[in-house]
Design a protein with these regions (language model features):
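Bacterial Sec-type N-terminal signal peptides, specifically the leucine/valine-rich hydrophobic h-region
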Residues: 16-19
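Residues marking helix boundaries in flexible regions
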Residues: 10, 21, 58, 200-201
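Active-site-adjacent structural segments surrounding the nucleophilic cysteine of cysteine proteases
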Residues: 22-111, 157, 171
Length: 203
């Protein structure tokens, strides 16, 4: 009887030790796993910096021929409003439309169909509400966005869509961006698709 009781106590003690051990080890394992993942991401970002350190920023030229209509126009308005909200500033659609004036294109019913902008127009507009900084290289832009900054840019080979860069997917080698027309904050674009980026900070 005493032996049976002793066995029960021994089994209970082993189980208790096992539970305590698991509880003690788990946070360390999670921390190690998290640290390992962070290190991998940092290594991938470093590779991207090296790859793009000599790549210039792609921009439009300040000529009439280089002027592109930003289709729909809502993407420019949405990008500016998103940046405003990021800095707790409420920028109304009417305020933005008034600023662009005759650059705003409308249909016969008065609906906005686009906004015609070149690089100077784009830069001036962003600096009207924010401090818009020209990144001197692709690597610099990638680094700033990866470290929490945001940037407005024009997307695609026709430069006809305005979006806000929010982050970097180091695994895919792409920017993560907000799109006011398509919706969502998890859209992705290749670095080569980005034109006229401006790093946005509060004035």
């Amino acid at each position: 009887m005493k032996l049976k009781r002793l066995l029960k106590i021994t089994v209970f003690a082993c189980l208790l030790f096992s539970v305590v051990s698991c509880q003690n080890d788990s946070p360390e394992e999670v921390m190690y796993s998290k640290t390992s993942m962070e290190q991998q991401t940092e290594q991938k970002l470093q590779c991207l910096y090296e790859m793009y350190k000599d790549k210039p920023i792609q921009s439009l030229f300040n000529t009439t021929r280089a002027t592109r209509e930003v289709l729909n126009g809502e993407c420019v308005i949405g990008a500016i409003q998103y940046c405003g909200n990021h800095f707790n500033e409420n920028i109304s659609k009417n305020e933005i439309v008034r600023y662009f004036g005759d650059k705003v294109q409308r249909d016969r019913n008065g609906n906005i169909t686009g906004i015609v902008l070149n690089t100077s127009d784009w830069d001036a507009a962003l600096n009207n509400w924010f401090t818009a900084t020209y990144p001197y290289s692709q690597a610099y832009l990638i680094n700033e966005i990866a470290n929490g900054k945001i940037a407005c840019c024009r997307l695609g080979s026709d430069r006809s869509h305005a979006v806000v860069l929010l982050g970097v997917d180091a695994d895919a080698g792409k920017f993560i961006y907000y799109d006011s027309v398509l919706g969502g904050e998890n859209n992705k674009a290749a670095f080569t698709e980005i034109y006229d980026p401006r790093i946005i900070t509060k004035k």
